[in-house]
Amino acid sequence: MNIAALISGGVDSAVVVHLLCEQGYKPDLFYIKIGMDGDEDLTCTAEEDIELCTATARKYGLSLNIIDLHRQYWDNVVAYAIDKVKRGLTPNPDVMCNKLIKFGCFEQEAGHLYDKTATGHYASILEKDGKIWLGTAQDPVKDQTDFLAQIDYLQISKLMFPLGGLMKNEVRDIARIAKLPSAQRKDSQGICFLGKINYNEFLRRFLGEKEGDIIEMETGKRIGTHKGYWFHTIGQRKGLGLGGGPWFVIRKDIDENIIYVSHGYDTDKQYGTDFALHDFHFITEDLWKGAPSADVSFKIRHTDTFMKGILTREDNLFRIHSHVPLQGIAPGQFGVLYDKNAEICVGSGEITLS
């Protein structure tokens, strides 16, 4: 079996290479470059990444190929993120990167030449009723199925997740014992293309600043100013620059550039327990066979907690009623649905409050 292994320079993908080689495979290694050339601030740690990837390839006598997809990434993933922010929504570029770049453009460029593509994602492949499903990882803290919830059946059919049955500490132990070049490297945080700058600085470069009012939700009183609604997301409590906190962002008026905040943030009163998903995407198929309601697990952000609730259908919307109050439901983010035992990731849709 011919295997392409996506390698990033991190410990997870290096352990994937080690495990594949231990099983007798000789995968071809691929590093996907997505950082923007010509701007030292807006680049990933590509040079260091490639050095570690090269060392890993050399250790196992494998070939390393560098695939430059930075233009496709910026034209699709970054453009998507900026568009969502302009519309007052909260984007998830990691989800779109997996769908469009890692398992989209890469498949067109090189992946189609291989039987399987292996990655360091914490997820698993399950077979049920003769079909392939995206399964959750053994390690709930590291589970990344929510980042994979927009891929399609053809993509999931080609993927291998060798780390799916391992805990993170076990992965670290394997890397240490095998003396992998990246064994001591820290896990990456945040969005890769941001490089050396933070998210707000990235938004400032592309969207600028525009002063607007901060209004207390309960009283309608103006209590401060902000530099643009695009710097703030629903549920946010840091970075508002207000005294007497904590303050939470409750709502955004993008037409008037107003941020509404609340001092107490009572989730029952501010949001309740219900939200909707539109344009729902099934990875394999409808696990619930079109049933009008079903018990489900779900996530509304990247977290180690699978929430419990009830799914109902209304026209083109999936409505979710959570068993417990939710904080910071952010329109634009992906709501990810699982079976009630949180073993199968069924798919995802974009969160809306309508």
Curated annotation (Swiss-Prot):
Q: Where is this region: Interaction with tRNA?
A: 142-144
- Report the active site residues: C97 (nucleophile), C192 (cysteine persulfide intermediate)
Please list the GO biological process terms of this entry: tRNA modification
Kindly list the GO CC terms recorded for this protein: cytoplasm
For this protein, the Enzyme Commission number is: 2.8.1.13
Q: Which residues cross the membrane?
A: none
The site feature described as Interaction with tRNA is recorded at: H121, Q333
Disulphide bridges: C97-C192
- Keyword RNA-binding annotated: yes
Q: Where is this region: Interaction with target base in tRNA?
A: 92-94
Give the main localization category.
cytoplasm
What InterPro entries has UniProt attached to this entry? MnmA-like, MnmA-like_C, MnmA-like_central, MnmA-like_central_sf, Rossmann-like_a/b/a_fold, tRNA_2-thiouridylase_MnmA
Q: What positions does the entry give for ATP binding?
A: L6, I7, S8, G9, G10, V11, D12, S13, I32, G120
Q: Name one GO molecular function term.
A: tRNA binding
The record's family statement is: Belongs to the MnmA/TRMU family.
PANTHER family per the record? PTHR43052, TRNA-5-TAURINOMETHYLURIDINE 2-SULFURTRANSFERASE
Q: Tell me, what does this protein do in biology?
A: Catalyzes the 2-thiolation of uridine at the wobble position (U34) of tRNA, leading to the formation of s(2)U34.
| Descriptive protein name | tRNA-specific 2-thiouridylase MnmA 1
Native species: Phocaeicola vulgatus (strain ATCC 8482 / DSM 1447 / JCM 5826 / CCUG 4940 / NBRC 14291 / NCTC 11154) (Bacteroides vulgatus)
